[in-house]
Every structure is written in structure tokens, then in C-alpha cells.
Regions:
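Short, glycine-/small-residue-rich phosphate/pyrophosphate-handling segment
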Residues: 160-201, 339, 363
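Accessory alpha-helical/coil subdomains and C-terminal extensions
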Residues: 11-12, 18, 22, 40-67, ...
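Short, acidic/small-residue loops that bind anionic groups at enzyme active sites
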Residues: 135-169, 173-181, 304-316
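ATP/NTP phosphate-donor binding region
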Residues: 1-116, 361
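ATP/nucleoside-binding phosphotransfer catalytic cores, i.e., glycine-rich phosphate-binding loops
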Residues: 2-3, 9-11, 269, 292-392
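Ankyrin-repeat inter-repeat connecting loop/turn
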Residues: 421-422, 453
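Ankyrin repeat structural motif
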Residues: 405-415, 440-452
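Short Gly/Thr/Asp-enriched flexible loops that form oxyanion-binding sites at enzyme active sites
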Residues: 126-149, 292-301, 328
């Protein structure tokens, strides 16, 4: 056994594999690949890595809300380098789905299956199609509350019955980690890497390295020698409440909107006026930037929607990096009431927003506040600004507002930048004192905010 590793006690752990469908269980047909039942006996039992040759035994699986127990055939893996077997059973959904058809009802079905069997198994592996896998990972990470056991989702780019496939290593790796390491998170295992589920996104339609975790390193990796777990990255709930699930979701009340060059305020307004819309994930340029539109018309559209109670969350279109008000466009969005989503993926932001909007005791302001903080490790909390350009954009705006004598604009700028911009200088050394201050009240306001006259 590895020094410093964390393994579950006992010679044999129990894992429930939940088969929802997807490429991993598909077989050839006259109409191409289709999901097929009988995965355990057809795909797993004949393979030595999944079957040590010992006599299979039945273990009970709860199949409905009434607590009905049904015996399922189980097999056992050969003994691992950690001197432990993993015994597993497969529960197949009656209707196997292509993951492009998975929706909130499918997520609820998965969550309920885990909840019913939570005390009977040490861990859970969910087999799922790859198209919507990152969405399901993010959704489950919020639906499964106070999780204390591993839940690992995986799938494949090629069916297990095909000669060249990634299904076998993906499933075996998931089973080994689930059965040996106490990583109490919703994770995604693919291509020998275990990633936090709500940090993942699909990056390839064909490659075996189909998923990435752009802003967080893998929680674990498997090599020919061992499984390496980065225990310092593992998220653990500090809440002592019992495991529960939240199945009410507002998925029909949230939407994503991708900013593009030349986007018209009228188009955005139409989206924000959709019947029943409560939340919007705004996919912006770079570090959270979006065009303001002619005379700030687009920014006003966002501000008006926020005033109507719509929660708008700003995430970047970039693969890596974070939303941060380094530039004026991002700062203007933040002043309009748009919530910075930091380095959340679009999938995680949508899942989190629909989860929070469905919680009965949260106000809109509560939802806004919780969207900006980490609940399940879905974003990196920034405690301080690591890097910032000199604030020339806001400084220029302030000087311009002062020169116009617009006290209202000056107050609006100082809302977000109070305490530093009044004493900032641009690359030429110009400060707010360079331009004429037209009103005594404005001068008094700047002095109250800390203007240095020395």
C-alpha cells in the first residue's frame, strides 16, 4: 500500500454502476450504433480486469421510492496493488438514452437512484454519453448535498464492444478509484484523469482526450505504476448534515447568451424578455468584456433586466482564465448589476443558477451573492487582485465626467472605485486635478473620497 494514501478499510468495497446509456454501451445495428441492454454480462463479465473468476453473487439494489430491493448479479475485480477487491453490480435504466436527450428529469433519476442506495454502497459510477456529460456532472454536483462518498461519471468515444475503444480504461479507472479512494465529490474520469465534475467541459468530438478541466488540475491520475491523488485539491463538505438531494430545478428558467461582435441591444432585450426567464449566463469576451452598444444601450438593457429581478452571470468564452473587472467594459457590466462568474465554466454556471433559483428560501439577492462564491469547488475564489493594469479607463472616465460637470457620472464611477481612482495617475502622470472642477459640491465629493491635494 502506498505511503500516505487514503483507502477505504476492508478487503472488498462495493460500487454500484448506474447505466444511463451513451456510446459506451452501444452495439452495431442496421441503423448505426444504438444503446443496448445487458452491459454487465456482455461487456464486463468476460474481461479479466472486471472479473477475477470467483463465483458471482447477488447483492440487493433499491429500485424505487418504496424501498423495493431487487437482487442484482455482482462480480469482483482481481485484487489490486492496494490489496483490495472491488465488488460491483450494474443497474441499467429501463430506457437507455443518447446523452443529447438527457435533461433535468434524467438528472433527477440519477440523483434519486444514488439517494436510495446511498447506505448500501461505498461509491457510485455513472455511465453516460459524452455529449452532455459535463452538464450532468455540474448538475449533480449541486443536486447531491452534503455528499460523503465518491460519485464518478464516465463514458467513452467508442463502444466497449469495438476493437479500438477507450471504454475499457475509462470504466476500469473509474471503478478502481471509486473502490479505493475516498474522494467525496462528483467527478468525471476520462483518459486516465479524474477531474472535478463541475470544472469540466468537452473539448473534442473524436479524440480519446475528450474532456478538460481548464482551470483546475486533475484530482487524480492513473499511470502504469500507481494512482496519484492530489489530496490537497479534494473538496470535502464541512457541513455535518446528512446526505440529501435537491431535485427541484429551474432549468426551464435559465438560458445562455454568447456575446459576439455587433450583437444588437434589441436581440439581447428579446432574450431577456422571454416568458419565465429568471437567469442568464452571459458568455463574454476575454476577462468578462462586452460591447456597451450605441450610447451604452446594451449596458442599459442588462441594467434594466437586473432591476426586473433577472440574475445575470458573467463567464468568459475563453477556455482558461477568469472574469475580472480589469477593463472598463467588464467594470461597466458589474456596475449594471451583472454578477462576475469568475472562472466557472458555462456548464457549471447554468447548473448552479438553475439550482439556486429553485431553492425555496433564497431571495434574488441571495442567489446573486451565492453565484459569486464557491459552493462545490466550481470556481476559484479570488481574495485579492493578482494583476491589474493602471486604471486609465476609469480614470479617463472620471476626468471626463469632472470636465463636463456631471456630478451623477462622477458618483457612479466612484461607486466601484472609491478609495483609489481619485488619486490615480495615467501613464502621463495626469490626475483628476488636471481638469477643471466646475462645482464646489464635486470638489467636496472628491475630497471626501480621499483626494490627495498635496
Amino acid at each position: 500500500m502506498e505511503q500516505g494514501s487514503e483507502t477505504q478499510p476492508g478487503p472488498e468495497s462495493r460500487v454500484l454502476i448506474i447505466m444511463t446509456g451513451g456510446t459506451i454501451c452501444m452495439r452495431r445495428s442496421m441503423n448505426g450504433f444504438v444503446p443496448a441492454q445487458g452491459f454487465l454480462e456482455t461487456c464486463m463479465a468476460p474481461q479479466r480486469p472486471f472479473n477475477d473468476g470467483s463465483s458471482p453473487s447477488d447483492i440487493n439494489v433499491i429500485i424505487d421510492d418504496e424501498g423495493t430491493e431487487q437482487p442484482h448479479r455482482s462480480y469482483r475485480t482481481p485484487i489490486s496493488t492496494y490489496q483490495k477487491h472491488v465488488r460491483y453490480a450494474v443497474l441499467e435504466f429501463k430506457e437507455l438514452l443518447d446523452s443529447s436527450s438527457v435533461n433535468a428529469d434524467g438528472w433527477t433519476h440519477i440523483a434519486q437512484t444514488i439517494y436510495r442506495n446511498y447506505r448500501l454502497f461505498d461509491a457510485f459510477v455513472i455511465l453516460h454519453g459524452t455529449d452532455s456529460l459535463a452538464y450532468t456532472c455540474s448538475a449533480l454536483s449541486f443536486m447531491l448535498q452534503n455528499l460523503g462518498k465518491p460519485v464518478i461519471l464516465t463514458g467513452s468515444q467508442a463502444p466497449m464492444l469495438e476493437l479500438q475503444n477507450d471504454a475499457t480504461p475509462n470504466l476500469l479507472g473509474s471503478l478502481i478509484i471509486a473502490g479505493h479512494f475516498m474522494i467525496p465529490e462528483v467527478c468525471l474520469f476520462f483518459n486516465y484523469s479524474l477531474m472535478r465534475g463541475n470544472r469540466t467541459t468537452k473539448v473534442s468530438a473524436t479524440d480519446f482526450a475528450a474532456f478538460a478541466s481548464p482551470n483546475l488540475p486533475p484530482l487524480a491520475t492513473i499511470s502504469s505504476l500507481k494512482t496519484h491523488v492530489s489530496w490537497d485539491l479534494v473538496y470535502r463538505s464541512i457541513n455535518l448534515k446528512a446526505f440529501s438531494i435537491q431535485t427541484s430545478r429551474a432549468t426551464g428558467n435559465v438560458a445562455p447568451l454568447r456575446i459576439f461582435p455587433g450583437i444588437k441591444p434589441e436581440l439581447v432585450e428579446a432574450v431577456l424578455r422571454l416568458d419565465g426567464l429568471k437567469g442568464l449566463v452571459l458568455e463574454t469576451f476575454g476577462a468578462g468584456n462586452a460591447p456597451g452598444g450605441p450610447d451604452g444601450a446594451l449596458t442599459r438593457v442588462f441594467a434594466d433586466a437586473v432591476k426586473r429581478g433577472i440574475v445575470i452571470v458573467n463567464v468568459t468564452q475563453c477556455m482558461t482564465g477568469t472574469v475580472s473587472p480589469l477593463y472598463e467594459p467588464a467594470m461597466l457590466l458589474q456596475r449594471a448589476g451583472v454578477v462576475p462568474g469568475h472562472d466557472m465554466t458555462s456548464e457549471a454556471a447554468l447548473a448552479k443558477l438553475s439550482y439556486l433559483l429553485a431553492l425555496p428560501n433564497l431571495t434574488i439577492e441571495d442567489v446573486r451573492q451565492q453565484m459569486a462564491i464557491s459552493l462545490r469547488g466550481e470556481l476559484t475564489a479570488q481574495t485579492s487582485v493578482v494583476f491589474a493594469h493602471p486604471g486609465t479607463a476609469n480614470l479617463t472616465s472620471l476626468c471626463y465626467a469632472i470636465s463636463k460637470g456631471s456630478e451623477e457620472e462622477v458618483q457612479e464611477i466612484l461607486k466601484g472605485d472609491i478609495g483609489w481612482v481619485v488619486n490615480e495617475a495615467d501613464y502621463s502622470g495626469n490626475t483628476p486635478l488636471v481638469g477643471p472642477i466646475l462645482h464646489i459640491r464635486m470638489a467636496r465629493k472628491l475630497l471626501i473620497c480621499g483626494l490627495n491635494t498635496g
